[in-house]
Structure formats: structure tokens, C-alpha cells
């Protein structure tokens, strides 16, 4: 019976040319040092990877190792953000970034983004961690990077942000609502305005676009193709396969 190994990291024995990590090392790091419960990890992996996760088998000098493809890619410092952004997702991605930094602070980390966005607060946690860790962060949009996903896409290291040919990137103003006493509604409205200003400043900083233009464009859903995203400054390169 196959066991679902969502974030299992297995060290390549003897022949590892780069610094690798031992089996279950990220799992232990997330639980013991980042305070992420095993239940949260299980829920995250079940929602993200699902039951159709492909497994690969690698022949090693001393054994044969089986792991899911996402764990194998993480060994190459590749993180997938392929779902909506909430607190649980943010906790895992932040832990992955910090873990990979602890393994090797000089090698780049790549984040593949295919996300419709989600919680602004959770997304800002990922954003701040991306800016905090020492390795350069390469971002690649595969499919869609919308709302908070677009903010994370443009927040990669300058010169290392890319999108596939038919990807779409969308920015807009933050959404929110409130109910209750008028004073509470006013408090929420002020907070949304603060978040709006903060997000627009982040996008302006990473794209080089004037803050006023971001304010105007993001008033409603502002969709961009990969080429348009490059011209806008959201990415630096459009990735086109050799078969194109």
C-alpha cells in the first residue's frame, strides 16, 4: 500500500552533488520549529496534491526510493503554490522557504504560481518571508496569478520573474466586507483602505509603475497576458518552449 508522502524529503545517498536533506526533515522542521500541526500538513497535502499525485521511483546506490513528484521537486528547491491562499497554505509555504534557506542560503528558490489569490493577510505573510530569506526567489506563473497571487508573482527577485506563454496575471483592489455596529464597519473600511494602499505600493515598487497608475488600473479587475505582464513590469521573461 502506497503512503501519501506530501512533503517527504529523501537524501540522495552517496552521489548527491548538492546539499540535500534527510527523509522527513522538512516535516520535522515544520512541526517542531514552525509550530505547524501534523493535521494541518495532512489537510494541506490532501487538498493540494489530491489522490492523483504521481509517484516516481529512483534507483540509488544502496536502495530504491519512492516519493511523490512534489517532494522530489522540492529537493531541487522548487515550491508549488497551486491553490487559493489562506493561513494554512501560507504557513506551509513560509516554512518551506525558511527550511530551504536553512539548507543552503546561497542557492535560488523557485516558486511556481497558479493561484486565484485569497487572504491578503496570509499572502502578505508569504510576501514578507520571500523578502526576508537570503536566497533569490524566482517566480514562474503557470496558468493564473490573480489578486494576491499576482502580488507574489511580481515580488520575485528582479530579473528572475517569468510566466508561461498563455498565463494570465490580474490585479485588482482588495475585497472585504463587514456587518455590525456602524463604528465596526468604519474600522473595517479604514483597514481595507490601508491594505489597498499597501498592496499598491508593493506592486509599484516591484514593477516600476507609478503608484497613481496602479491605483487607476486596479480599480477593477485588470487582466494581462504574459507579454502584457512583461511590458507592465510584473515579470521579466515569457517562457516559450522549444516546440513553439
Feature locations, PLM:
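Compositionally biased low-complexity segments, especially N-terminal hydrophobic helices
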Residues: 8-9
Amino acid at each position: 500500500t502506497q503512503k501519501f508522502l506530501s512533503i517527504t524529503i529523501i537524501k540522495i545517498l552517496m552521489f548527491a552533488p548538492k546539499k540535500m536533506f534527510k527523509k522527513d526533515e522538512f516535516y520535522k522542521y515544520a512541526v517542531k520549529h514552525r509550530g505547524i500541526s501534523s493535521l494541518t500538513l495532512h489537510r494541506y497535502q490532501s487538498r493540494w496534491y489530491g489522490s492523483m499525485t504521481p509517484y516516481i521511483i529512483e534507483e540509488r546506490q544502496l536502495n530504491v526510493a519512492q516519493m511523490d513528484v512534489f517532494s522530489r521537486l522540492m529537493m531541487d528547491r522548487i515550491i508549488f503554490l497551486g491553490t487559493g491562499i489562506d493561513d494554512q497554505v501560507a504557513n506551509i509555504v513560509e516554512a518551506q522557504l525558511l527550511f530551504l534557506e536553512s539548507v543552503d542560503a546561497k542557492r535560488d528558490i523557485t516558486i511556481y504560481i497558479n493561484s486565484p489569490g485569497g487572504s491578503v493577510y496570509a499572502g502578505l505573510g508569504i510576501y514578507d518571508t520571500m523578502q526576508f530569506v537570503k536566497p533569490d526567489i524566482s517566480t514562474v506563473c503557470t496558468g493564473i496569478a490573480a489578486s494576491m497571487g499576482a502580488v507574489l508573482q511580481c515580488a520575485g527577485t528582479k530579473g528572475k520573474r517569468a510566466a508561461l506563454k498563455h498565463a494570465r496575471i490580474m490585479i485588482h483592489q482588495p475585497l472585504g466586507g463587514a456587518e455590525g455596529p456602524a463604528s465596526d464597519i468604519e474600522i473595517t473600511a479604514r483597514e481595507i483602505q490601508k491594505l489597498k494602499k499597501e498592496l499598491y505600493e508593493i506592486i509599484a515598487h516591484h514593477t516600476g509603475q507609478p503608484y497613481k497608475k496602479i491605483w487607476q488600473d486596479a480599480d477593477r479587475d485588470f487582466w494581462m497576458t504574459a507579454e502584457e505582464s512583461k511590458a507592465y513590469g510584473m515579470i521579466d521573461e515569457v517562457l516559450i518552449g522549444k516546440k513553439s
